[in-house]
């Protein structure tokens, strides 16, 4: 026999929160108390009594009424809350909060009387859009810079460079120095954690080490020893080192320079699968242009999403923001771990607290973007069909087989594909029903003016030359 319907009152609160008042009949309170007493009498061990055969009066005497009432109330709260959610169709985002607190309710709890419970919880917000079409988004036009081809080639040259020993001069900027060092803090002489190394290669370029270190090594000769005075940046990742002055005892053991390969067809074969420099340049230019186009498309999407979010009306609950903040911090930790950084020592409680505080803005922005797209999909009835999902799934599964990937979660893969396809449709709708104004960046405008000015100057000079009267 199912329990009688509960008398429930609900009222909306700010930030997608709901207040729930439940009237629990006295008979249910009494039943819960009796059940708790019976359960405890079966589980408690008391000298002189067999387990499970302890009289209830002895249990009450041993444990006290409040202990039994606490057990009864805890069980009652759980059951009543589950029934309330089911009865009222409430989908909570977090555990409920008791308005008066458990201890206060327990203090006033009488199993013979009706219990009034007042709880609050967060619920999923219902987003709406004031407007979704006829909007205007401004986006900076990303102009492809041919110089990037040369930059990539120079990076490849640096990677394929030969290290040549140097012994007849002091260390210079750009050299590769083999050094050993030991660091300590200037204020108390304590050793710096991770501040010592034996025979490691360091490229003498600014930004490779903390300020003062590279500058100090430059000018040293092989076998020289020197004490460098440095200072850790105020935003340094290790909390105990932030802004502190330090001293490093450094010895220069060896010195090398990078000898770059010549830019010829042999280099093209080494750096790529191309046979000559002409093909290599053409391939790099093609890839860079494609990358530029992808970035431009992403910039357009971001701009359209920004103007759509401005039309969004949504009340974000605290629990959702907190959850998104945790996700951002966890992703940050994973990124550092992938770079080989010791996350456990780096992520101190102070740093985690600081990161969580500073990530709130980003978390709210991401949630607003998510709800704006959800509201658009609902209002415009934009959906992805099973046929579209299965077609894309077949393509992806074929690629997975070719790459010999294993341990793929089929359900998560399908969810990701569905989300991607829906997002494609949503942005296609936004592009079609709104205006994107592309603006030329100021730097690019200056370059265009400069080129135009040079062309005019060249043309004027030619005209001057042609207008001169020839000598007779």
From Swiss-Prot:
Molecular-function GO terms, alphabetical: peptidyl-prolyl cis-trans isomerase activity; protein folding chaperone; ribosome binding
UniProt keyword list: Cell cycle, Cell division, Chaperone, Cytoplasm, Isomerase, Rotamase
Residues in PPIase FKBP-type domain copies: 174-261
GO CC annotation: cytoplasm
Pfam family membership, one: Trigger_N
Region (Disordered): 438-472
Entries under InterPro entries matching the protein: PPIase_dom_sf (IPR046357), PPIase_FKBP_dom (IPR001179), Trig_fac (IPR005215), Trigger_fac_C (IPR008880), Trigger_fac_C_sf (IPR037041), Trigger_fac_ribosome-bd_bac (IPR008881), Trigger_fac_ribosome-bd_sf (IPR036611), Trigger_fact/SurA_dom_sf (IPR027304)
Subcellular location: Cytoplasm
One of the GO BP terms on file: protein transport
Keyword match Thylakoid: no
Catalytic activity: [protein]-peptidylproline (omega=180) = [protein]-peptidylproline (omega=0)
Domain of life: Bacteria
Family, as annotated: Belongs to the FKBP-type PPIase family. Tig subfamily.
UniProt note: domains: Consists of 3 domains; the N-terminus binds the ribosome, the middle domain has PPIase activity, while the C-terminus has intrinsic chaperone activity on its own.
Role played: Involved in protein export. Acts as a chaperone by maintaining the newly synthesized protein in an open conformation. Functions as a peptidyl-prolyl cis-trans isomerase.
Protein name (record): Trigger factor
Organism: Prochlorococcus marinus (strain NATL2A)
